[in-house]
């Protein structure tokens, strides 16, 4: 039965190549024949490139051909400028994520919708997940710069809408545009990083581009408190100005070097397709699998949202609207599966990638990691402020420990990958350490413990989480060639983002089904009737002085709720102990890219 399932969904099984062929030279002298390495067993490890070839691969997809032409054309100065601009883009993303992340609880509380944080996260995550594969196709079929600038437009629109919204509905819509845009920008930058680096140095390249998070971890929370004291709308408004200013030079750099490549003859004009406008529209609807994207996004949103909002409805799970959403969501997911299997000429996901156990293992590891993380993270800043009495700035610093520690640690991880030409051994350390960090948070979550123990757990999580993220990216890229690099990264991001949506759904379900009951049980009789007001607003919760019976009751209710979230996250993360063994121990000596590289 398993073999028949594989034949249906996967193209061909992996067959070992011939062995005994000499490894490629690294001195620029071409090898006369394709090469494999003594310890490789699978086709993904076969090197079919001529090491001395200085022409872009005309048989690759247009976006890949253009990327190779650019790296063969540009100078070291252009390479340095590209990495500096990508570093700036990560800096902008880090600042806006840190600032708006610390303000989101107050923005939603201002609309009396604090409990809707997971709902917004679920919708944003699902829509982002549905965007990755179409974006990868834009990057592959058209141009890296085109996909990048489209995502900049989405992010800018989301920021403008967030700055001008006056109700929770508009804010939710703004967050969807904003999340799609910034997720797409970072994905585009990661693909460009893969285009412009060797496989051995890719870990270091990703460490460099993501290093701005070290800076934003300190500046973001303090800026968030300043915006909260003055006007939170400018937290979004200022970035709607800054983002285009930083992004346009990157777009211009790519377009200019593309122009140089065409002028030098490395890049040829694309032949006219001969399609009419209507034929082109139909072609791209099929190519981007718009039908599949619609059913996937609708199915996930409708199926996951009830878990977060059922507890806040009058009839709970008996509510007709909740039952309807679950049924329609399940039907949409079923239709998505049937459409992908029997109807779609170009499926939403390149399922054949899962024939590689490395891609499968990395994707499932990322799913477990994201679910486990978002099981407890969405309400973590609120938890720190209520239970430990931290300010917005201090809570932001604690949640930013991951960015600081992992930002520095990733350089060491990248160096270790470069020196050993291996990455899997790092997972054997990182996965157990992550489980330990989350597990210890269960024990230290109570108000009676010092916040220092929570900081210790965050440091463990930062070391482990940063290592897992970089190893997952290197794994899927090592298991594919340059032509499929964007698709492989998109595949990983789709799984990870859907995992974050599931984690947010679990978090919301625990919150709405645990915290109200805990408040009604623990609050003094004098304020029991006000439990709904307290539940809906973080500002209301913080208005009670620390040490009072009311504040202590709220803190204990938070601790009880956080405990269930952490237990769920730890249990799910334990599955990663299996997935890390599924990933193959690939030696990172393949030649994938050409030209002037990182």
Swiss-Prot record:
Region of interest called Disordered, as start-end residue ranges on this chain: 1-34
Cytoplasmic side: 1-76, 137-144, 193-203, 255-289, 340-341, 418-424, 472-490, 584-598
Organism field: Aspergillus fumigatus (strain ATCC MYA-4609 / CBS 101355 / FGSC A1100 / Af293)
Family label: Belongs to the major facilitator superfamily.
Cell compartment(s), UniProt: Cell membrane
Root EC class: translocase
List of glycosylated residues: 102
Domain of life per record: Eukaryota
Extracellular side: 98-115, 166-171, 225-233, 311-318, 363-396, 446-450, 512-562
PROSITE patterns: MFS (PS50850)
Function statement: Major facilitator transporter involved in fusarinine C (FsC) uptake. In contrast to TAFC-mediated iron uptake, FsC-mediated iron uptake via mirD does not play a significant role during infection.
Transmembrane segments: 77-97, 116-136, 145-165, 172-192, 204-224, 234-254, 290-310, 319-339, 342-362, 397-417, 425-445, 451-471, 491-511, 563-583
Record's keyword terms, sorted: Cell membrane, Glycoprotein, Ion transport, Iron, Iron transport, Membrane, Translocase, Transmembrane, Transmembrane helix, Transport
Membrane topology qualifier: Multi-pass membrane protein
SUPFAM superfamilies membership: MFS general substrate transporter
Induction per the UniProt record: Expression is repressed by iron.
Record GO biological process: cellular response to iron ion starvation; iron ion transport; transmembrane transport
Enzyme nomenclature, EC number: 7.-.-.-
GO MF terms, alphabetically ordered: transmembrane transporter activity
An example Gene Ontology CC term for this record: plasma membrane
Record note on disruption phenotype: Impairs FsC-mediated iron uptake.
Keyword Lyase: no
Designated name of the protein: MFS siderochrome iron transporter D
